[in-house]
Amino acid sequence: MLASVAGPISLALVLLALCTRPAMGQDCSAQCQCAAEAAPHCPAGVSLVLDGCGCCRVCAKQLGELCTERDPCDPHKGLFCDFGSPANRKIGVCTAKDGAPCVFGGSVYRSGESFQSSCKYQCTCLDGAVGCVPLCSMDVRLPSPDCPFPRRVKLPGKCCEEWVCDEPKDRTAVGPALAAYRLEDTFGPDPTMMRANCLVQTTEWSACSKTCGMGISTRVTNDNTFCRLEKQSRLCMVRPCEADLEENIKKGKKCIRTPKIAKPVKFELSGCTSVKTYRAKFCGVCTDGRCCTPHRTTTLPVEFKCPDGEIMKKNMMFIKTCACHYNCPGDNDIFESLYYRKMYGDMA
């Protein structure tokens, strides 16, 4: 009797398990099939991450957006996919982990929440700190024979400035005078080199976007196959944030230009760690109001290994010498990352 009853009961339990598994588990059973084209272009401030199944790169979902196993929330903003009750585990909502709120411009934002401080900046609150990225293009237009006087202007009804080509004041018998057509100082490719009817031009690297910790430095060049202007970027670290450099200033001195680092370091980027250790140079500090910034640098590739095993290679600035000066960004500059001080002598 028991045996005859156990059969139907066991079958019912198996069927119940099969029916509830898609709702309770993670839907990663499908074969990895990613789009043939390059990785998607994410909006400003949105991370490009691997989907929850480790298959394809996707734009991370933001606070309050719907999420699934294949459409994860932005981990760099402390977000996770809250699936709610155990009975519904297919679709969730991106929720912020516990973190301190931010007060910005008289408004309070939750940790993980993104907002526009103005039409020019997209900001994110993360555990009490606000980080912003520009929404307007930061491109640089170099002078050229067809546009020797480029200038950025604010146009009516538009938020971002745009490039316009001013007519030269003086004209010669053979056309506009090119007296203002000067090449910027460059390091690397020869700026006077003509290659396939292309005048190669490269600007200097901009200052690092962070005064301490990992930041970004950029430059513009047309040194490519199509002779088109493109922006290049590299990682940079002027000094570690946790280092107390003032204690290394010698008695009677007001600055320490390039402090000695006791041991090799590993760089970190968005949870990923450099494969190798580096005995890098960093810039020091002053006690008389001056700031120390990189003066001569070089660019080298650095490999980073992420927790999921992915290896990514990024170009990074390595400091050769530093200079201490009074040309410093303002202490109340909220968007200090937009401050640029040119660096010289880069060999890459």
UniProtKB/Swiss-Prot annotation:
Keyword terms: Cell adhesion, Disulfide bond, DNA synthesis, Extracellular matrix, Heparin-binding, Secreted, Signal
Domain TSP type-1 as annotated: residue spans: 197-242
Main location: secreted
Species, as recorded: Mus musculus (Mouse)
Entry's Gene Ontology cellular component terms: extracellular matrix; extracellular region; extracellular space; Golgi apparatus
Keyword Membrane attached: no
Domain named VWFC: residues: 100-166
Any one GO biological process: fibroblast growth factor receptor signaling pathway
Annotated stretches, region: Heparin-binding: 246-348
Cell compartment(s), UniProt: Secreted, Extracellular space, Extracellular matrix; Secreted
Family: Belongs to the CCN family.
Protein name: CCN family member 2
GO molecular function, one term: integrin binding
Annotated TM spans: none
Span of domain IGFBP N-terminal: 26-97
Subunit and interaction comment: Monomer. Interacts with TSKU.
Residue ranges annotated for the CTCK domain, each copy included: 255-329
InterPro entries: CCN, Cys_knot_C, Glyco_hormone_CN, Growth_fac_rcpt_cys_sf, IGFBP-like, IGFBP_CNN, Insulin_GF-bd_Cys-rich_CS, TSP1_CCN
Signal peptide: 1-25
Induction section of the entry: By growth factors.
UniProt keyword Cell inner membrane, yes or no: no
Tissues in which the UniProt entry reports expression: Testis, spleen, kidney, lung, heart, and brain (lowest level in testis and highest in lung).
